[in-house]
Amino acid sequence: MKAGIHPEYKAVNATCSCGNSFVFNSTLDKDSIHLDVCDKCHPFYTGKQRIVDTGGRVDRFNKRFGALSSGKK
């Protein structure tokens, strides 16, 4: 490998919104990152049903134009 062309590989601390934190190795410039969900609080892994989606463009579109596409032709 050529010297000086590869990014630095270092430990990064990840903190989830549920309070869980863990360390992983990465080439990120940051020392820590914040996650919305992790394996301790994600509904797929916990088996609990809760809405994870924070909304977006599709939801806004459906709110505005959902009545128009209600199946009437």
Swiss-Prot record:
One Pfam family linked to the record: Ribosomal_L31
One of the record's GO molecular function terms: metal ion binding
GO CC term, one of those recorded: ribosome
Cofactor(s) listed: Zn(2+)
Manner of cofactor binding, per the entry note: Binds 1 zinc ion per subunit.
Residues that hold Zn(2+) according to the record: 16, 18, 38, 41
PROSITE patterns xrefs: RIBOSOMAL_L31
Disulfide bonds: none
GO biological process: translation
UniProt keyword annotations, A-Z: Metal-binding, Ribonucleoprotein, Ribosomal protein, RNA-binding, rRNA-binding, Zinc
Entry superkingdom: Bacteria
Role: Binds the 23S rRNA.
Subunit structure of this chain's protein: Part of the 50S ribosomal subunit.
Entry similarity comment: Belongs to the bacterial ribosomal protein bL31 family. Type A subfamily.
Protein's name according to its UniProt entry: Large ribosomal subunit protein bL31
Gene that encodes it: rpmE
